[in-house]
Amino acid sequence: MKTYTICGSMKFAKEMQEVAYYLETQQDCNVLQCVYTLDDYKPTKEELKKLELAHYQKIDLSDGIYVLNINGYIGESVSKEIEYAKMHGKEVIYHCK
């Protein structure tokens, strides 16, 4: 069973949760998510940096990343995550071809 970290814009948070559920229930994958349900909470710069570092550690632990590129959208942060994953020999799967 492979482990994947989901990478995508937070504007697709709901979709990332749906994809994680699908991958775990239908594709026999383990999924490391980065979506947190914190209504009306704005993280501090320090918290954002900690979350970013944790996300890269999740990529290190994973066999690959699953890029949620809805309508072809890949932002700056996700582009960096893709490059990081490739540099570390990780599989990169794109949601939209």
Which residues make up each language-model segment?
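Conserved catalytic or regulatory cores that recognize and/or transform ribose-phosphate-containing ligands
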Residues: 1-97
